[in-house]
Regions:
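Amphipathic alpha-helical substructures
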Residues: 1-43, 47, 52-54
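Asparagine-centered strand-capping/turn motif at beta-strand->loop junctions
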Residues: 56-60
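Conserved aromatic beta-strand anchor motif in extracellular beta-sandwich/beta-rich domains
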Residues: 68-72
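A surface-exposed beta-strand-loop module
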Residues: 106-123, 140
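Terminal edge beta-strands and adjacent linker/stalk segments
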Residues: 141-149
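Exposed beta-strand and adjacent loop surfaces of beta-rich binding modules
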Residues: 51, 63-67, 125
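Short acidic/polar inter-strand loop motif in beta-rich domains
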Residues: 132-142
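Solvent-exposed beta-strand/loop surfaces of large extracellular or lumenal domains
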Residues: 76-113
């Protein structure tokens, strides 16, 4: 059965079988930080960049690939897909996700945190959500969404 899934998905799934069937480890991810990106000028000073840095944290011991959905003030939605290096491949987006689908660099399973850039200024982001489709068996979803504070 595992080999059928690997053939159909065109990726290695031994790691998933080992974690899911042979351990009691759990899946738990969180949005650890959202901050404006900076860029260094030719004079050496830093200025705000027109993008946002998002840092995710793996709190559980079960690594999984992630889909992080970002929505801006205009209603545009991006899905940042973060594969695991263990997979040696990546998921193909569903047809309705194809526009705005952005594959990121693999997340090495030994690293507890991962940072990526969103091409939108922080003040134009309405929300950032890990696993909007709720397909991930995350044990604590309370830390899976970030929204700007209403000050």
């Amino acid at each position: 059965l595992l080999r059928i899934f690997e053939h159909e998905g065109d990726m290695i799934l031994d790691w998933y079988y080992e974690y899911f069937v042979e351990t009691t480890k759990n899946v738990d991810y969180a949005i650890a930080a959202v901050s404006p990106a900076t860029q260094t000028t030719t004079e050496g000073s830093t200025t705000p960049a027109p993008q946002t840095e998002v840092t995710l944290e793996r709190l559980g011991d079960f690594p999984m690939p992630l889909e992080v959905q970002v929505t801006d003030l205009n209603g545009q939605v991006w899905t940042f897909y973060i594969p695991l290096r263990l997979m040696r491949g990546e998921k193909t987006p569903n047809p309705e996700q194809a526009e705005g689908w952005m594959v990121q660099e693999d997340w090495p399973w030994v690293e507890p945190s991962y940072t990526f850039s969103v091409p939108v200024p922080t003040d134009e982001i309405v929300s950032i959500t890990i696993d909007e489709s709720m397909l991930l068996a995350d044990v604590d979803r309370s830390n899976n969404t970030w929204e700007p504070s209403k000050e």
